[in-house]
UniProtKB/Swiss-Prot annotation:
Biological role: Important in genetic recombination, DNA repair, and replication. Possesses pairing and strand-transfer activity. Interacts with dda and gene 32 proteins.
Protein name: Recombination and repair protein
Lineage: Viruses, Duplodnaviria, Heunggongvirae, Uroviricota, Caudoviricetes
Top-level division of the source organism's lineage: Viruses
Pfam families for the chain: RecA, T4_UVSX_C
GO molecular function terms noted in the UniProt entry: ATP binding; ATP-dependent DNA damage sensor activity; single-stranded DNA binding
SUPFAM superfamilies on file: P-loop containing nucleoside triphosphate hydrolases
UniProt xrefs under PROSITE patterns: RECA_2, RECA_3
Region (Disordered): 364-391
Keywords assigned by UniProt, alphabetized: ATP-binding, DNA damage, DNA recombination, DNA repair, DNA replication, Nucleotide-binding
Amino acid sequence: MSDLKSRLIKASTSKLTAELTASKFFNEKDVVRTKIPMMNIALSGEITGGMQSGLLILAGPSKSFKSNFGLTMVSSYMRQYPDAVCLFYDSEFGITPAYLRSMGVDPERVIHTPVQSLEQLRIDMVNQLDAIERGEKVVVFIDSLGNLASKKETEDALNEKVVSDMTRAKTMKSLFRIVTPYFSTKNIPCIAINHTYETQEMFSKTVMGGGTGPMYSADTVFIIGKRQIKDGSDLQGYQFVLNVEKSRTVKEKSKFFIDVKFDGGIDPYSGLLDMALELGFVVKPKNGWYAREFLDEETGEMIREEKSWRAKDTNCTTFWGPLFKHQPFRDAIKRAYQLGAIDSNEIVEAEVDELINSKVEKFKSPESKSKSAADLETDLEQLSDMEEFNE
């Protein structure tokens, strides 16, 4: 390390200051995989990835499975780290110990804090986060931001005032401005549930409530939609779509589909078949049948297997195991969804560099001068006279 770098690092007041390649922020980050491959891809852009530290927001209308998806991530974190603790800030009071157990979360490892206002959430959260040391395993779960009033809104109601609260968005921004640095410096994932609403425009948009604060602070924002899964006229469940509104790892506006059925819960294989079809590693040799294809890396040829499968028979490790172990399939997923470095064209860069460094030259006017307006008028008169003569 150069003397200048050493002196600058030594002069810093932060204990975490280090050369970027040796920084804990980039080299000591937890990656927590869930039991749902499509969720892992939505979180990181690759099958082997998953949830990392930072603020993750799940937003959507009522009954869009937001809390369930959030608890699925909490369960995965606590399963990976048996000594982990969950800080649960509760404003909806709909999650019971029995419900937590059904989602794979041990209630004895959950610290439950009922909150009634944004100000209370801000004070409690910053005090608890400040007490955590980096390396201690903690996951934060907020259910929900959309249901939290500001202190002023509550006071206005008690004083029988009916004016609109113009401070809520400002308070929300203050909350995340204070707590977000803790998530990165202490390697803590925070999963927050939020609501959405439709804008009042000719072509309405689905946007997240709470102002700009949550969106600015979040590493990932999923806006969740859903559609019915039916067998004839019988409703069997719902297909939820994770719309990537913001992400630091995945291409924005990507969509990831996850099926939840009444008789089996979350389908861990949901979304994979359509994705593999789109990427070209699964084909339909005939209607209703599917076959895998593998890339021969020596010839670049896609080799199709002889066996064909029905769609319902593909939901198994027998079908997906060979594809998950196939590196070109993993690489194709990363190319399709993961944010990568900006590609550069060396030839174009060299041309632009040459233009920038070229010498200034004095402009030389062309030898043949353009005609004046008077000359053009004379030409037009002559042309008109010739036309009259020909007639």
